[in-house]
């Protein structure tokens, strides 16, 4: 089965079947965050740095970095954001942009083996992104839509994913370095959105043997109490074979749900990570043997 290895200057992370589910922190993204966007545009990266540290401390094994700000110098801002993040945390980065010049600027600044986020199945996009992926020996997120749009049929999305994997091979990019995004749609608008993704992830795993990722919170868009849906959705994705996702690790219940998914699928063997994360420390004066004697006397 495929394993996708990403790295920072000092640390490797493996995305793959049988490995812990990889949480890619989503917070360094100015979309919908007016204060962050204004700060980044003005050259203030203090919030970027704080978000990087907080997400890694919360359990993120990778970070997504996006600098998509209207009327700003995205290539320069993305490169500087990456430099600032790499100065304070040691996890690998997903370099997130739809602007080819920004992707190249980010890749040139990055120390390690990055994940490029992303390409679609559109021929023009493939021909611009894949040469960069090869040039910088990166891996790439493959979004399973093309010129025809997003199909509700998992089989059509599978065809797009297969097309991307085949095009990547033409550039010398191995299947294990293509991480497919099956596209999570809002379940409030498409009642079968969850089942569509589960079916497609299983098919991608069994037939293409590629790793997968997604923007998991898309599933709850427009609904109340979104965290409840997100927290249920992620273990189901893990059970279907999803190997990573872009998430907000600052929600402890979501991190716990992901770790529970690893436990229940046998990846967290012996529940080692679960126990080390959630075992309550013994209270001062606690003595299990004394407690057992007390119970016997009672």
Task: Give the role of each language-model region.
Residues 1-179, 185-298:
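Domain-level signal for soluble alpha/beta catalytic cores
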């Amino acid at each position: 089965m495929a394993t996708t290895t990403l790295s920072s200057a000092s640390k490797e992370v493996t995305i793959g079947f049988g490995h812990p589910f990889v949480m890619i922190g989503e917070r360094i993204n100015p979309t919908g965050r007016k204060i962050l966007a204004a700060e980044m545009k003005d050259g203030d990266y203090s919030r970027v740095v704080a978000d990087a540290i907080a997400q890694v401390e919360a359990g993120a094994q990778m970070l997504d970095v996006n600098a998509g700000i209207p009327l700003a110098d995205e290539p320069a801002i993305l490169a500087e954001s990456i430099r600032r993040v790499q100065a304070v945390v040691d996890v690998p980065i997903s370099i997130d942009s739809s602007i080819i010049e920004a992707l190249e600027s980010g890749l040139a600044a990055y120390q390690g083996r990055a994940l490029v986020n992303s390409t679609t199945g559109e021929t023009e996009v493939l021909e611009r992104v894949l040469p960069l992926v090869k040039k910088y020996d990166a891996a790439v997120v493959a979004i399973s839509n093309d010129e025809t749009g997003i199909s509700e049929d998992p089989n059509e999305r599978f065809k797009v994913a297969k097309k991307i994997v085949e095009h990547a091979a033409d550039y010398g990019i191995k299947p294990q370095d293509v991480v497919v995004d099956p596209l999570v749609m809002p379940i409030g608008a498409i009642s079968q959105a969850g089942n569509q993704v589960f079916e497609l992830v299983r098919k991608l795993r069994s037939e293409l043997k590629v790793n997968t990722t997604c923007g998991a919170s898309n599933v709850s868009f427009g609904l109340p109490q979104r965290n409840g849906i997100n927290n249920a959705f992620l273990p189901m994705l893990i059970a279907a074979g999803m190997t990573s996702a872009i998430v907000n690790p600052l929600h402890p219940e979501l991190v716990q749900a992901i770790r529970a998914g690893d436990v229940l699928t046998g990846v967290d063997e012996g529940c080692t990570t679960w126990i080390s994360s959630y075992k309550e420390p013994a209270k001062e004066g606690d003595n299990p043997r004394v407690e057992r004697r007390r119970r016997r006397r009672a």
